[in-house]
Amino acid sequence: NLFGNNSYVYYYQSAFRPPNGWHLHGGAYEVVNVSTESSNAGTTECTAGAIYWSKNFSAASVAMTAPQNGMLWSTAQFCTAHCNFTDFVVFVTHCYKSASGSCPLTGLIPQYHIRISAMKNSSLFYNLTVAVTKYPRFKSLQCVNNMTSVYLNGDLVFTSNETKDVSAAGVHFKAGGPITYKVMREVKALAYFVNGTAQDVILCDGSPTGLLACQYNTGNFSDGFYPFTNSSLVKEKFIVYRESSVNTTLDVTNFTFSNVSNATPNTGGVHTIQLYQTSTAQSGYYNFNFSFLSSFIYKESDYMYGSYHPSCKFRLETINNGLXFNPLSVSLGYGPIQGGCKQSVFENRATCCYAYSYNGPPLCKGVYRGELTKSFECGLLVFVTKTDGSRIQTRNEPFTLTQHNYNNITLDRCVEYNIYGRVGQGFITNVTNYAINYNYLADGGMAILDTSGAIDIFVVQGEYGLNYYKVNPCEDVNQQFVVSGGKLVGILTSRNETGSQPLENQFYIKIINGTRRSRR
């Protein structure tokens, strides 16, 4: 039934006429996701004869249903519905318009008729024109991967020899909605046939009823116990940590600079300023030690004179205050305070330049044309080459990260675990109520191991005290379904699951709705 959001549909080929009885067969599609849409035509009407609206999927089947009364084949309500199988598109539309630009995909369609078409690489390769007397209103379009089948109002209107998942689908409409999109997964089904017609269907969907029926290949059971196996698909993983928090101290690389006492003056121009103690940061945390600058005098920027660092909003004394960079390189040089910094930045020797005076001799040559042979006061020039980013960060002290660990333990299903460093698969149950009165895990122990070395019982400190958990095998070889009065009423298992009741040396889990699925 396409109109039930928690429902399923079952298709079988008309040539499939098995003998009377139960038969395991493909062709069932179960709803796994539902969404609705009220309208997607922004103008006074939708555009017929064209595909204007689509939603992306990756599904075995997608069903698009209108309200049960259906929608009129009119641009005031419904225009086009389509199924996209990646390589080609199947769509149903109408278009009784002759104006220029109308019906771009189909051309004029006769009045009171609809068109079912298939298109590949912008070329139509299938066309079927049907009178609306057969389909008075649009009610549903379902796209199915098996043989790329398309069903209009429940009738098969297109199929091919390919099987492909649905990649997109949509309904373009103005009113009469909402349209409900149902994404479906393919499951096997056990169907009961009478005279070649399916009368009853049980989905092999992992539910208790599906497990029982599809394993025994029948839907009719007398009262009794029925052993069964169920291979669990592990989808979840959790970690139980030894410590509630872990502190990690990150290394800080230190670059310490010092005065160069035997530095030679430049001989004219910035390219003759020799570089010393070049230090380049790659990534991580860094500290730049310029303590020797305390005996130098910082020179502010004054036109050609002094420092020049408009691209660096910091002084060297504050470079360690958590600043972030991508590449960062620092060098020392000795050159003229007059023009040495500004011209070095202009000629791309550095991004920024900081000038310091130490009352040096006037032995440095000029850096500008016409001043290359003139002598100026020598000073200390600190060159910084950088771009902003996040790979490098400066720090005044080592940096400590604190990681807080939270133990979110997944119960009552097969999971992958990492418990205090031991890994494996298991079915975890809470046994605190059974272990609280016994001397489990004495002397501060955290886990009890079985003979194979795997974890059997482990303890976790909870908000209100210690909690004990048992690791069971994912597959219970002793589990049995219980049938009473022809209905599935419970499960006998050797595992103490949440909500189970002790029954001698086993546990009983009651099934509230154990009746088999019936055809809707």
Curated annotation (Swiss-Prot):
Keyword Transcription regulation attributed? no
Q: Which residues are glycosylated?
A: 5, 33, 56, 84, 121, 127, 146, 161, 195, 220, 230, 247, 254, 259, 289, 408, 430, 496, 513
User: Extracellular side of the membrane: what ranges?
Assistant: 1-520
Top-rank taxon, per record:
Viruses
Q: Which InterPro entries match?
A: CoV_S1_C
Q: Name one GO cellular component term.
A: host cell endoplasmic reticulum-Golgi intermediate compartment membrane
Give the UniProt keywords, A-Z. Answer: Cleavage on pair of basic residues, Fusion of virus membrane with host endosomal membrane, Fusion of virus membrane with host membrane, Glycoprotein, Host membrane, Host-virus interaction, Membrane, Viral attachment to host cell, Viral envelope protein, Viral penetration into host cytoplasm, Virion, Virulence, Virus endocytosis by host, Virus entry into host cell
Post-translational modification (record): Specific enzymatic cleavages in vivo yield mature proteins. The precursor is processed into S1 and S2 by host cell furin or furin-like protease to yield the mature S1 and S2 proteins. The cleavage site between S1 and S2 requires the optimal sequence [KR]-X-[KR]-R. Cleavage is not necessary for virus-cell fusion.
Membrane-spanning residues: none
Query: One biological-process term from Gene Ontology?
Result: fusion of virus membrane with host endosome membrane
Q: Does the keyword Phosphoprotein apply?
A: no
Report the Pfam families cross-referenced here. CoV_S1_C (PF19209)
Q: How does it assemble?
A: Homotrimer; each monomer consists of a S1 and a S2 subunit. The resulting peplomers protrude from the virus surface as spikes.
Q: Which family does it belong to?
A: Belongs to the coronaviruses spike protein family.
Q: Could you tell me what this protein does?
A: S1 attaches the virion to the cell membrane by interacting with cell receptors, initiating the infection.
The protein in question is named: Spike glycoprotein
- Organism from which the protein derives: Avian infectious bronchitis virus (strain UK/123/82) (IBV)
The major lineage groups are: Viruses, Riboviria, Orthornavirae, Pisuviricota, Pisoniviricetes
| The encoding gene | S
